[in-house]
From Swiss-Prot:
Belongs to the SecY/SEC61-alpha family. SecY2 subfamily. It holds the Pfam family SecY. Part of the accessory SecA2/SecY2 system specifically required for export of possible cell wall proteins. The central subunit of a protein translocation channel. This is Accessory Sec system protein translocase subunit SecY2. Keywords: Cell membrane, Membrane, Protein transport, Translocation, Transmembrane, Transmembrane helix, Transport. InterPro entries: SecY/SEC61-alpha, SecY2, SecY_dom_sf. One of its GO terms (biological process) is intracellular protein transmembrane transport.
């Protein structure tokens, strides 16, 4: 029992559970002076936005302190990665402290847009001043987002999983309700439900296969002298991006809806914003085609974010390691990037097939939207669980050795 309590994995796990308790507690703190019984805010878009916000730690169903979740921070990370590819901007030339500060400024700007779009459409209770309630709730929503960012950083330091745990908790809280509601609405028979369960098991097997499959590149290490093993290996996943592109796509694609809602409130006489909101609504053809295209592009882009040929080549050059038959430096970088691109295309096709193709059924029946999103949700869920599992395995590695005396 003493050994169990002294385990690093157990200590970090307990810290994570405590931080999750704080997250759940904060998600139950409702925004003040708001009519929680009204569901007609956001121009009727609440049901669609709630689905995407739930993937980023938010919840529009309860209108709480954490309603917009980590979505602004995730959108800021995507935009920062896009901007950093431009050498003219020189974003990577400054110190990491300056970069982190600028990322927070970008997060603040996006959080303000989302908070303003939400608070301008909230149903305020009659006796209170709408403007003061608007200022108060906007401040609370922005503060809630930054509190979640801080909570994620704390969990990354003393807990397990970093921000993934918060996103996982939000998904687990909303996913069962959406599945049960979809089964009730479409009156799925037991036979069809059994078939879906079989397909779910097959889907889980494919996800595990793609996540665990690795391509190993033999690396010659100067300091490695063993007649039993000449090489160490650089491993590249069959799907280098994993399931994370799906979640980031949902976060980024929700941003235009918030911006249009805010513009619609500022320019109420202009019918253009209402028409654009209607055409871009979740489940509409424009949204579906944009979603599939961005998912494909992000699956390739995130592969190069996770496996950077330039960084690996630089590290190998500094340590004196090399790939047999490939010159160190730029040749090694190009060799690795070609492999990453090849596997990124395989992963992109896999992600689009499992998380994108089912959404095409929504073109025939919009009520199938939540059902068609379930494969993508399981793709994210599997990736999160594997990430947490791998981190726990790494923490337990040092505990497998017993002291000599």
């Amino acid at each position: 029992m003493t050994k169990f309590r002294s385990s690093i994995a157990v200590k970090k796990g307990m810290c994570t559970l405590f931080l999750l308790f704080i997250y759940v507690l904060g998600s139950r703190i409702a925004l003040p002076f708001v009519d929680l019984n009204s569901r007609n805010f956001l121009g009727g878009s609440a049901a669609y936005l709630d689905f995407s916000v739930a993937l980023t730690g938010g919840n529009l169903r309860s209108l709480s302190l954490f309603s917009i979740g980590l979505s602004p921070w995730m959108s800021a990370m995507i935009l920062w990665q896009m901007f950093s590819f431009s050498k003219k901007l020189g974003l990577n030339s400054v110190s990491s402290e300056v970069q982190d500060r600028r990322k927070m400024y970008l997060t603040l700007g996006i959080a303000l847009i989302q908070a303003l779009a939400l608070t301008t459409n909230l149903p305020v209770q009659a006796p209170y001043n709408p403007f003061l309630v608007f200022l108060l709730n906007t401040s609370l929503l922005v503060a809630g987002t930054f509190f979640l960012v801080w909570l994620s950083d704390i969990n990354a330091t003393i807990g397990v999983g970093g921000p993934v745990v918060i996103l996982l908790a939000s998904m687990v809280a909303s996913l069962p309700q959406d599945i049960i509601q979809s089964i009730q609405v479409h009156k799925i028979s037991l036979g069809l439900l059994f078939l879906l369960l079989v397909l779910g098991v097959l889907f889980t097997y494919l996800v595990v296969l793609f996540y665990r499959a690795r391509y190993r590149i033999p690396i010659n290490k100067i300091g490695l002298h063993s007649r039993f093993k000449r090489y160490s290996y650089l491993e590249i996943m069959l799907n280098p991006a994993g399931g994370m592109p799906y979640m980031y796509v949902m976060s980024l694609m929700g941003l235009p809806s918030y911006l249009l809602l805010l513009l619609q409130h500022l320019d109420k006489g202009n019918p253009l914003y209402s028409a654009m909101l209607e055409q871009y609504a979740m489940g509409k053809p424009l949204w579906i085609y944009a979603y599939i295209l961005i998912l494909f592009v992000f699956s390739i882009a995130f592969a190069f974010v996770n496996v950077s040929g330039q960084q690996i080549a630089d590290q190998m050059k500094q340590s004196g390691d090399y790939i047999y038959g490939v010159y160190p430096g730029e040749d090694t970088s190009r060799f690795i990037n070609r492999l990453v691109l090849r596997f990124a295309l395989i992963g992109a096709v896999f992600n689009v097939t499992l998380a994108g193709v089912p959404i095409l059924f929504v073109l025939q029946d919009e009520s199938l939207l939540k059902v068609s999103m379930i494969p993508g949700l399981f793709l994210i869920l599997s990736g999160m669980l594997f990430t947490i599992h791998d981190e726990l395995q790494a923490l337990r590695l040092n505990e497998r050795y017993q002291p000599l005396f």
